[in-house]
Amino acid sequence: MTKDHDFKKLVRARMARTGERYAAARAQLARKPAAVGVHPESAALVSLLAAAGVAGPGGGAPSEALVLGLGGGLGAACFTFEYAGHTPTFYVATRCQPQYAYDERFVRTAAERLGARCELATASSAAVAHKKLAARVALGPVMTWLSFGELPWAPRLGPVGELGAMPHVVVVEAITGDVATLRDLAPAAFEVELAVLARARARLRAARFRTLVVAAGGDAPDPRDAVRDAIAACVAELGGASRVRGPMAKNFGLPGLARWAAALDGRDKKKPWTRVFPPAHAAHALAWTRHWIELASTGGGGFRPLYADFLDEAAAILRRPALRSVARDYRALGAAWSGLATAALPDHIAPFAAVRRAQDTRHAASRRGDLAAMRRLRDAFDPELRCAPRRGRAPRRPRRRPRRAAARRGGARGALRLFGGAGHRPRRRRGGVRRAARRRYLMSPP
């Protein structure tokens, strides 16, 4: 947990930002409960907003539900990944795009709708990144992006490499010597060696060494307009609006869920669920399905209960009591999503029930921040998930050419690839390089 001198650093940093006296600044920080977060980006932003003194529409501290709703709220997407030599896997998203912290759009949107300013910074090397992080942490808490799988409290569904470099955000509260104090979703803060933190931050490509701080004093919109805009964005996304273009766009929104339903009940004759995931792969796919709905920092029920809390707050802000009825509907919908997740690994099939219990044990240990339990469970996964890869020729190892030379030959698109620009997706082309790049792009959860 955070040591006394670390807490004093936070108090003095708040004094410098707000002009408060020591007792007032300390009281404000001490009042902040050791809350258990639900969603990493929402929880991290709530922490930064509290430290910056940014209030919600009612004058109190913004809730995590309010941040989720203002950031864009709900969404939906379904993807099946099949490659020769690899076990097929399934992914379902239930929040607005992108559900994971591939960029800062969700955080920036929510903060600006609350009238806060976001200051983003990146670095070109680990040494420069550490200097920038230390300088920012000296003034207050900092949000940073890193690879979730590198953290000692990250739960495991299967082998570490199965998740790839899953982007994640934490709040760095203090740096003492060679140890950083991090706040994630557990009630207590974690202390992590700076070398581990640097490795986790360097693992990402587009978000490499990215940090973000929040400050008060932005152009605060009318809270009612902000809430209306946020709800409209959520409605559009559920309707299928997507930044993704091409054939993959049909997998988003309610149309994407309809395609999944057709695959499950066999109406999709081309690729029914039982053909994509035969008995040898069924446990693997069903375990991932439950993980994405219940355990992937959704708060359970695919974010629907948390969004219902936002709708209750929106009803008060907009003075529209009818939204409370919609909130009740979303709580019922969340219960239905949880029921679907439970049906994926039911009690009456003993091996599936064992997988579900193992998932819950790991998840509970991670939520408690019980590192001892996490160490015992590290890299352990259930025999039912040890599925043989799908038959087929193993992917050919592609020949590589120097990235900088490729970028020079590729013009603007090559430069975009070289620097990990947003929106790049490898094109299909004859030869192994493009196919292998596309395979790596899709095998990591979107």
Describe these PLM feature segments:
Residues 1-29:
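C-terminal alpha-helical interaction appendages
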Residues 12-16, 27-32, 39, 49-57:
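N-terminal membrane-targeting/anchoring modules of bacterial envelope and secretion proteins
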Residues 34-35, 97, 162, 290-297, ...:
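Short, charged/polar micro-motifs that form catalytic or ligand-binding hotspots
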Residues 35-54, 72-222:
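Conserved active-site-adjacent core of cysteine acyl-enzyme catalytic domains
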Residues 50-62, 312-317:
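Short helix-capping/linker segments at secondary-structure and domain boundaries
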Residues 67-69:
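Accessory carbohydrate-recognition regions in carbohydrate-active enzymes
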Residues 177-298:
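Noncatalytic regulatory segments and standalone regulatory/sensor domains
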Residues 291-446:
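Charged, long alpha-helical assembly modules
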